[in-house]
Amino acid sequence: MSILVADEAWLATALLHREHPDAEDFSLDDIRDRARREFHDNRPGVWQHIVSHCVASNRPNPAQYRMLHGSARGRRRLYRPGDPVHPERKGKIYPDKSAIPERYRNLVDWYLSDYSKASPDAGSSSAAVWLEFVGLIPAYDLRKMSQAIRDCERVDPNEW
């Protein structure tokens, strides 16, 4: 059975997640190397799918897959509902079980029952990310937001 390069990229990433459950994400090279070891495949399309074609937040060019999440520069993990998605991406999130060898179908089951139900990575809401975001807010708007927060803190809960 010939496996689509997008499915190879997803399967290699899923295998890494299962083999390293404490790892949040993996380098592009780690995923490519895992795909090569598993599938003995050197098709350049696998690399392109890891880098761009399967990344949900990227503009589709041409693929619309939502199989991977770009968690940081040069890092990927499997996509989870709630991750950022480019509005033009409507493609598949995981391989069709009938299109992959039987020995990998349990990875799709694991993804659906466990992985996809976990919340998106906490790294996206880390203090450093929030501080970087706050740094983008104009000072005037930041003062208004701070005042609104202070006003809300003075609300008497007995009034509700």
Located regions from the model:
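Residues within the alpha-helical elements of helix-turn-helix
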Residues: R34, E38
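A short acidic, leucine-rich amphipathic alpha-helix
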Residues: D30-R32
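Short capping segments at the starts of secondary-structure elements
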Residues: H17-S27
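Alpha-helix N-cap and coil->helix boundary residues
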Residues: F26-S27, G45-V46, S125, K144
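Onset of an N-terminal alpha helix
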Residues: S2-A9, L28, S126-W130
